[in-house]
Amino acid sequence: MKIRILCMFICTLLLSGCWDSENIEELSLVIGIGLDKPDDENLELTQQILVPKIISAKEGSSSDPTQLSITKGKTVHQMMRTSALKHKPTFSQHLRLILLSKSVIADQIGMDAIINQFVRDNGTRRSSYVFITNGRTKDIFNMNDEGEPASNVIYDLTENNKVTIRTMEPVTLGEISEHLTSDDSFLIPHVGKENGKLAINGASIIKNKLWHRDLTPIEVQNISLFSGTVEGGVIDLKRDGHLFSYEVYSSNRKIKTAYKDGKFKFTVTRNIEGRLSEDWNPNEDSFKDSYIKSIEKTVEKRVHETVTSFITEKLQKEIKADVTGLGNEVRIHYPQKWKKISRKWDDDYFSNAEIDYRVNVIVRDFGTKGANK
């Protein structure tokens, strides 16, 4: 009898359904968050909210199905609470990106303080991407591509790093939290406008938890070829006065780390495979091994010169910020030494390290056109 009553009780629990369900049309889904510093006293929070009701009403149109909520306050949590008074409950489980205005982290407020609330909040995805922009974040969020919200456009643009070397890999909130905990210098992709369109154009260096300097897309390319994961892209060069394009298929790198007489030495070898995708030389003969070898040597020489110059002259001597991951190699191979020097790594050790960069290039293919004879 007791077993029968217990079974009936369990059945009633199963029939009760989902007690905490929410009607999706009544929800406000935050897909993008922006932070600005409009004055010396306050921060400004911009939330791009995807409203299902607007999607239903504007189905088939090219209108942006989002709303912007803008709130001022002294802390991020305070602004979040104030924003909650203006709207129906918002949910950040679908947050795609966090956009920081340079003004927020270029002064005295450390980036660890700015993202502290997001890291602590269980409702914020640590996989959300983080970007920096020069102007107001609301100006970025106000842009849309034929009805596609800016947050989605920017998120999709991160896929371009597979086809261009000038765009760095996206950086997540969780990865930034790890960098800040370790006091590392690191890069964050930069978002801006180009010809009226949203674009990921370059990156920003974060050093000592503050914005330190912007990098151009070409400088990002140099870092990618030195230490990044290069999945594809095109390198334009000249040979005998004629342009040609080398398309990267795959790439890998190997690093050897040594320490002697108070100085670190790194031997970085970059192996690249690709194809001769375009050649403006009217006398080219891609069927000749000697011609292909000369193309390989030209690419090797150019990549070696540009990357070495940027790393040794600008990154080590001028910027003095290790955004290449070499410090992590020291941490792995010389853990006890790293504990003693980690806080002085950028200025005292990385800037004086000896770096030997080597490049091996292979042309695996030259397309469907060979010599036209």
From Swiss-Prot:
Residues with lipid group (N-palmitoyl cysteine): 18
One of the GO BP terms on file: spore germination
Lipid-acceptor residues (S-diacylglycerol cysteine): 18
Keywords annotated in UniProt: Cell membrane, Germination, Lipoprotein, Membrane, Palmitate, Signal
Ranges that cross the membrane: none
Signal peptide per UniProt: 1-17
Taxonomic path: Bacteria, Bacillati, Bacillota, Bacilli, Bacillales
Function, in words: Forms a complex at the inner spore membrane which acts as a receptor for L-alanine, thus is involved in the stimulation of germination in response to alanine. Can stimulate germination in the absence of GerD and GerK gene products (fructose and glucose receptors, respectively), but the response is improved in their presence.
Record's subcellular location: Cell membrane
Membrane topology per record: Lipid-anchor
Pfam families listed in its UniProt record: Spore_GerAC (PF05504), Spore_GerAC_N (PF25198)
Cellular component terms (Gene Ontology): plasma membrane
Main location as per UniProt: membrane
Annotated gene: gerAC
InterPro entries found in the cross-reference section: Spore_GerAC-like (IPR008844), Spore_GerAC-like_C (IPR046953), Spore_GerAC_C_sf (IPR038501)
Assigned protein family: Belongs to the GerABKC lipoprotein family.
Protein's UniProt name: Spore germination protein A3
